């Protein structure tokens, strides 16, 4: 899973613009943003460079979040 859509929204950047900068079709970038497809590591790195963000910002952690309510009950 990736956070491309969230970063684009936060920066006010359109998927069409990213597609042009990346040299990919709008449909491909849209599928990345919707998490229907995942970009290659190379493309993810290019996207991070284009958006001027750390590549980590585009990734979703696989670690489960701690349920704070559950921890409060214990």
Question: How should each PLM-predicted stretch be described?
Answer:
Residues 17, 28, 57:
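Residues in the helix-turn-helix
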Residues 24-38:
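Recognition helix of helix-turn-helix/homeodomain-like DNA-binding domains
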Residues 15, 26, 41-44:
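Helix-turn-helix DNA-binding elements, focusing on the entry/boundary residues of the two helices
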Residues 36-49:
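Short, basic-rich loop-to-helix N-cap that marks the start of a DNA-contacting helix
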Residues 22, 32, 43, 52, ...:
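Non-catalytic effector/regulatory segments
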Residues 6, 12, 31, 49, ...:
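Short, charged recognition helix plus adjacent turn
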